[in-house]
């Protein structure tokens, strides 16, 4: 029975968020293949992870058996979140671009889950090799050749922290662009391109969810 770790981070609710709708397409396809499977779901906007504090940060560099009671209590959440990543067979993350970077709630989650010598910074990180799908929606266009190409920080950062130099996950990005075109004056000429990008994102999410679920079921 495969386990999916699903994180949503959009500040917008279902129906108003492109990243949430696309992760939902992935999950629907996944669950169709694994109706009895397990999904670990965290809505980091509705139930945010607190920012990492000093005691918990230091505890990450100390063997658990040597923790003080204060360090053990502070590290408990980090251990829980890292364990959720380790238990998952696949990871799904909705990561919309906010002010040219990832949502702060996702950064807080990463700060807790990056445990050096365990999930990261180890010869073989504890979740290495697992497939991760990131829905990196954005209101504008930041692809190669666009005027704001140099403002693209989301994909390079997540590739580093989730990929070979971090958790060691096998990361694939789905990038719905121009999500603000239908509501932003001056972007009217981009509406059809935005719709096409959204359609492609849903199709990619459904295909990816189905394929990964089928592979893990084999």
Annotate each predicted stretch with a short phrase:
Residues 43-50, 140, 178-181:
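Short, internal active-site loops enriched in acidic
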Residues 106-125, 135:
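Conserved nucleotide-sugar donor-interacting segment of glycosyltransferase catalytic cores
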Residues 10-13, 139-142, 179:
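A short, flexible beta-alpha/helix-coil linker loop
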Residues 1-91, 95, 100-115, 202-218:
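N-terminal beta1-alpha1-beta2 submodule of the flavodoxin-like/Rossmannoid cofactor-binding fold
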Residues 3, 38, 130-131, 170:
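Residues at the starts of beta-strands that form the adenosine-phosphate
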Residues 6, 93, 132-136, 173:
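Structural beta-sheet core signal
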Residues 121-168:
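Short, glycine-/small-residue-rich phosphate/pyrophosphate-handling segment
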């Amino acid at each position: 029975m495969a386990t999916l770790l699903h994180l949503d981070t959009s500040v917008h609710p279902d129906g108003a968020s492109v990243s949430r709708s696309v992760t939902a397409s992935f999950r629907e396809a996944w669950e169709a293949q694994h109706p009895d499977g397990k999904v670990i779901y965290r809505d980091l906007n509705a139930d945010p992870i607190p920012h990492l504090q000093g005691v918990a940060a230091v505890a990450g560099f100390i063997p658990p058996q040597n923790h003080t009671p204060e360090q053990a209590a502070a590290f408990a959440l980090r251990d829980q979140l890292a364990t959720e990543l380790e238990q998952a067979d696949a990871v799904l993350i909705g990561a919309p671009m906010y002010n040219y970077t990832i949502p702060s709630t996702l950064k807080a989650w990463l700060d807790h889950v990056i445990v050096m010598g365990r999930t990261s910074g180890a010869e073989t990180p504890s979740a290495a090799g697992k497939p991760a799908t990131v829905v990196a929606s954005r209101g504008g266009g930041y692809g190669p050749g666009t005027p704001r190409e140099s403002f693209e920080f989301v994909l390079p950062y997540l590739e580093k922290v989730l990929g070979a130099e971090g958790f060691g996950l096998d990361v694939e990005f789905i990038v719905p662009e121009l999500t603000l075109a239908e509501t932003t004056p001056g972007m009217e000429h981009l509406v059809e391109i935005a719709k096409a990008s959204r359609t492609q994102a849903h199709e990619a999410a459904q295909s990816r969810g189905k394929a990964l679920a089928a592979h893990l079921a084999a």
